[in-house]
Amino acid sequence: MKSKIEIPRDEIIKFCQKWKISEFALFGSVIRDDFGPESDIDVCVTFAQDAHPDLYDLAVMEDELHEIFKRNVDIVEKAGLRNPFRRREILNNLEIVYAA
């Protein structure tokens, strides 16, 4: 699978370092053929053990990624994927962009 957008890797690296993200991956339509001009970008992240983001932090992160990608962004935390069906679907279809 290959993402349907250009990924500004330098900006993503800075973003991940700032927020203590150890893995940043794309999933959903951004890596499928149904990605279109109105599609958002789905991101799955894993935080470093010493990172403790709250809901406000996640909202700020989504805003920052919106500025980077110029699209709406939804973030899910890998550790927070509790539904086994959704977890399997997401984890089987990830494109890792950054890993520390």
Stretch-by-stretch model annotation:
Residues 1-25, 31-33, 37, 48-100:
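Catalytic core of pol beta-like nucleotidyltransferases
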